Amino acid sequence: MSLSPKQEQLFKQASKHIPGGVNSPVRAFNGVGGTPVFIEKAKGAYLWDVDGKRYVDYVGSWGPMILGHAHPDIIKAVQTAAEDGLSFGAPTVHETTLADIICEIMPSIELVRMTNSGTEATMTAIRLARGYTGRDKIVKFEGCYHGHSDSLLVKAGSGLLTKGEGEPTSKGVPADFAKHTLTLPYNDIPALKECFAKFGHEIAGVIIEPVAGNMNMVKPIDGFLQAIRDVCDEYKSVFIIDEVMTGFRVALGGAQSVYNVKPDLTTLGKIIGAGLPVGAFGGKREIMECIAPLGGVYQAGTLSGNPLAMRAGIEMFKHLRQPDFYNKLSVQLEKLLAGLQAAADEAGIPFKTQQAGAMFGLYFTDQEDITSFDSMLACDIEAFKKFFHGMLKRGVNLAPSAFEAGFISSAHSDEDIEFTIQAAKETFAEMK
């Protein structure tokens, strides 16, 4: 399935020298079928493909475009920074300014280190937890994604609660790496307590997406995040909240502010650079002082804290800190989700939505609640594929996977919301 012969030809050309024709697997449309859409430009709430077709965009470069694409203030900040030089490999005042902003907004972060991506941030946070505690095991949760580092590409495996070992989810990850990672069911407090009862004194840390945006969008049940905090305190393990996706999207203070839980370490992603390649990790001073050059845990990067990303992020936070910014986003998203739900109900299609700030999930199911990876797997993935292509055909861009969250930006207007709801009505009618 392809939108046009031109798109088909471009994908064929890309596949000649790029593995699978893409530089990140989800872009290949394997989750929905068909040929990827090649984008030429973006502005505000819209994307335009190489055929000139416009789409209302709910991917937002996978989250960071909270102000919409090509916001004039961000573009100006990047252009000004570029005129002064692209990268110095040396400190700038802009790194300090952005670090100050992040620490002020997220009080759990006393010291912060910039990286080049969310994967780098989570990878180093794991290394730091191990270095700080002198332990090897890490706990993660099924359905959560923390980047593509070896320690985190791991599933539960049959030996989890007998030998305390996980299994790789990717070829090339040594079994010796995976055995140190324990994968538990999301939102399962008894499993968490059982795991710590058996292996607690071997566990360096726990890492979790506070709102899981990689099994569509699953929120924590009451008490789940606090239960993690409690067992980490009891066993002196490091509690890592991965806010690469939720940070400054769910709320200004991140999901940790919404759920009133204080992690030891937090990881952040490209939103802190307004969408440019950047990440960060930070947290308690005592732990962060274990990072080189202060301590023995090594981390480095030539482009870490690069001036383009720093200055773009500083400019973005001026907008995010405006009164009522997040409330307006949330209200706009509520309109969208209510309209989509009404359209599905009218068509008699089992459908459910969930919202966390400016993030949302769409599920084809009659389940009352989606609280785990297993409940996500029980949704109708084939129905999502049909919905995705129906919406794409009508000019609405959703994530090309039933397992990815959606995002709204401050650029989405009432007209964009109505356009999307109308497209959904037509698509649902087609699916009946």
Swiss-Prot record:
* Alphabetic keyword roster: Cytoplasm, Isomerase, Porphyrin biosynthesis, Pyridoxal phosphate
Tell me the domain of life: Bacteria
Provide the positions where the record notes the PTM N6-(pyridoxal phosphate)lysine.
K270
Q: Where in the cell is it found?
A: Cytoplasm
Cofactor(s), names only, from the UniProt record: pyridoxal 5'-phosphate
This protein's assembly is summarised as: Homodimer.
Query: Can you say what this protein is called?
Result: Glutamate-1-semialdehyde 2,1-aminomutase
**Can you name the source organism?**
Acinetobacter baumannii (strain SDF)
Lineage, top ranks: Bacteria, Pseudomonadati, Pseudomonadota, Gammaproteobacteria, Moraxellales
